[in-house]
Swiss-Prot record:
It is a multi-pass membrane protein. This is C4-dicarboxylate transport protein. SUPFAM superfamilies: Proton glutamate symport protein (SSF118215). Its main location: membrane. The chain crosses the membrane at residues 20-40, 59-79, 91-111, 160-180, 209-229, 231-251, 344-364, 367-387. The gene is dctA. The keyword Transport applies. Signal peptide: none annotated. It is found in: Cell inner membrane.
Length: 455
């Protein structure tokens, strides 16, 4: 009797909801919030769980960026393609970063969250923000540009500086383009290494619920829900403004480019919850790059747009800066003319680039902006220090979504978006049908990346 061994494989049954990463992270956030609220000391003690997860992710970011960019650029084959992607990406970044600043400025003038507080600047404890102010003075646009160049090639990876790794990767990728066929063995080697590195990303993402649990328990335990109540108008205004920016502004951009912002958010829900839990958009950077490529964006575009966007396309941080600056002015009864507000916006445009990539960038950049615009008292930052931690989650999520949208849009502009695959993946029809991203000719089936994907 002949047995047919060529029959089509049986479709995999859908996994139970509790095995999806987004559900696990959501449960972890809720559990962390409860622990932090009812057992604050225990919540604070769980901080190492969140810190450890962030360190694990940062450990893998440099190789992910380097390998993605180098193999992507080598695949382009020409320097013209590199210049085209970079030009369109920075055009997008400048446009929407500026728009985010304007939205924050308009919202602050309309809602006026600081009006009626009547705070005397002299009564504020400026020592609380002294460290942030000193860091702001240390950072400058020139220093930022010089910091992009690493002391050595290896120091970029040792320090984990995203922009330095990006700089080295672009130079190396261009070098491979210029040597042509001689570079093919190197590209093949890096393709193989990237396969293993992205499998590591899958493994690390399985620890995401633990990291989110520890980080959120610490946040609630240390700062408490009560600290938000006193400045609820500011926090609420910021969350509302960020939501409107994502839905209206970014949503319109998505619509004009033929896709839905809500479907994109649904596709990235696990990563968004991870960003919420850890208050760090960086924690989801490797996973974002993987998912954008899986959705049909060309690797070369993903490799250039996502890492640079993390420094130059900070929509959430920009909304926060102008909104917080005007809140401080209103709370301290400091009247700003239209010209002064425009100056504030222009300074914020520059300082947001000069302080990119710095730990606590949002608060430091605000200090840098206020120090250049002396009309608004820097000491007023003490007013928002207690709730800044609760606004950082919203900043990070808005930054994250903004960079995801930028990647898809620039890919479409470049003709580097597989539209059929993109629609299928965002429509939830991908299942196991999408080919492995980092496929290797002849690689054993068990080595395929997406089989180990947490979500």
């Amino acid at each position: 009797m002949h047995i047919d061994t060529t029959a089509a494989p049986v479709a995999h049954a859908p996994r139970p909801f509790y095995r999806h990463l987004y559900f696990q992270v959501l449960c972890a956030i809720v559990a962390g919030a409860l622990i932090g609220h009812f057992y604050p000391e225990t919540g604070e003690a769980l901080k190492p769980l969140g810190d450890a997860f962030i360190k694990l992710v940062k450990m893998i970011i440099a190789p992910v960026i380097f390998l993605t960019i180098v193999t992507g650029l080598a695949g382009m084959g020409t320097l013209k393609g590199v210049g085209s992607v970079v030009g369109k990406a920075f055009g997008y970044f400048l446009t929407f970063s500026t728009l985010a600043l304007v939205v924050g400025l308009i919202t602050a003038n309309v809602i006026r969250p600081g009006a009626g507080m009547n705070i005397d600047p002299a009564s504020l404890d400026a020592s609380k923000v002294a460290d942030y102010a000193s860091k702001a003075h240390e950072s400058s646009l020139t220093g930022f540009v010089m910091d992009i160049i690493p002391s050595t090639i290896t120091s970029a990876f040792v320090d984990g500086n995203i922009l330095q790794v990006l700089f080295v990767a672009i130079l190396f990728g261009i070098g491979l383009i210029l040597i042509g066929d001689k570079g093919k063995p190197v590209v093949a080697l890096f393709e193989a290494i990237s396969h293993a590195v992205f499998r590591m990303v899958d493994i690390l993402m399985k620890a995401a619920p633990i990291g989110a649990f520890g980080a959120f328990a610490f946040t609630i335990g240390k700062y408490g829900i009560a600290s938000v109540v006193n400045l609820a108008t500011l926090v609420g205004t910021f969350y509302l403004t960020s939501a409107l920016f994502v839905i209206v502004v970014l949503g319109t951009v998505c619509m004009l480019n033929g896709f839905s912002i809500f479907r994109l958010i649904s596709y990235l829900k696990a990563e968004i919850l991870l960003v919420l839990g850890t208050s760090s958009s960086e924690s989801a950077l490797p996973s974002l790059m993987e998912k954008m490529e899986k959705a049909g964006c060309k690797r070369s575009v993903v490799g250039l747009v996502v890492p640079t966007g993390y420094s130059f396309n900070l929509d959430g941080t920009n909304i926060y800066m102008t909104l917080a600056a005007l809140f401080i002015a209103q709370a301290t009864n400091t009247d700003l003319t239209l010209q002064q507000q425009i100056l504030l916006l222009l300074v914020a445009m520059l300082s947001s680039k000069g302080a990119a990539g710095v730990t606590g960038a949002g608060f430091i950049t605000l200090a840098a902006t206020l120090s250049v615009v002396p009309t608004v008292p820097v000491a007023g930052m003490a007013l928002i220090l207690g709730v800044d931690r609760f606004m950082s989650e919203c900043r990070s999520i808005t930054n994250f979504i903004g960079n995801a949208v930028a990647t898809v849009v620039v890919s479409r502009w470049e003709g580097a978006l597989d539209r059929e695959q993109f629609d299928r993946v965002l429509g939830g029809e991908a299942g196991g049908e999408v080919a492995p991203i980092h496929d290797l000719h002849g690689a054993p089936a068990g080595l395929r990346l997406n089989e180990a994907s947490a979500d």
